[in-house]
Amino acid sequence: MPLIDYFYVLQFENKEYFKAFKLDESGYLTSSDLHEASKIHNMLEVIEVASELKTKCNVQCEVREIQVVKR
């Protein structure tokens, strides 16, 4: 199965921010609560953002790697 795309997202503690990813013929569809800024392709950047959120806002978040494959 070839890998189409991969990226990282931040999943917040309240879980209301991160819902789900769906893929259709036109591309990615995301839940209304997920903003484009949360789709990050660089692991260093996602670690910096998560660290800053923890330091400045006391927000816990986890990094999720999303891999999209074609069957």
UniProtKB/Swiss-Prot annotation:
Domain of life: Bacteria
The protein's name: SPbeta prophage-derived uncharacterized protein YopF
Natural source organism: Bacillus subtilis (strain 168)
Originating gene: yopF
